[in-house]
């Protein structure tokens, strides 16, 4: 029994390590933008993201957010970018949401809202808007 258990542990351990090395991992979210520098400024101003790497039209930011300019996206995918498509959203939590909205309106008065600041029936305050390139963003208070 001891030999069987040791063999099983060895096989299990080997397979687990192999699985860890070969299976993919989620690494982040890429959003398409017209101008990476303009988008970087927006995400830095509003959310505190910092630039990690700049590859001329492709940027890696902190918190695993990636920016790619629309020209590259359309060249690689052979598909058009569809701003304001409402297919997904970037979600953030902010305990001082009123302050956040005030900063957003001061720095980016042209921002397009989907929902102005509102309170859900469960008590969470949220605001939804598009970034400068039509990517949907939701900011809510922690639940």
Task: Indicate residue ranges for each PLM-predicted region.
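Vicinal oxygen chelate
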Residues: 7, 16, 101-143
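Conserved acetyl-CoA-binding loop of GNAT-fold acetyltransferases
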Residues: 45-52, 108-111
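Short, Lys/Arg-enriched N-terminal segments with co-localized hydrophobic residues
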Residues: 1-23
């Amino acid at each position: 029994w001891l030999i069987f258990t040791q063999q099983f542990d060895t096989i299990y351990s080997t397979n687990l390590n192999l699985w860890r090395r070969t299976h993919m991992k989620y690494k982040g979210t890429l959003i398409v933008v017209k101008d990476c520098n303009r988008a970087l400024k927006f995400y830095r101003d509003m959310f505190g993201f910092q630039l990690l790497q700049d590859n001329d039209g492709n940027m890696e930011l902190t918190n695993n957010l990636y920016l790619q300019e629309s020209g590259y996206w359309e060249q690689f995918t052979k598909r058009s970018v569809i701003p304001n498509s409402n297919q997904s959203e970037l979600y953030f939590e902010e305990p001082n949401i009123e302050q956040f909205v005030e900063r957003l309106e001061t720095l980016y008065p042209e921002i397009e809202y989907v929902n102005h600041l509102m309170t859900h029936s469960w008590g969470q305050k949220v605001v939804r808007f598009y970034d400068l390139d039509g990517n949907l963003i939701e900011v809510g208070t922690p639940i």
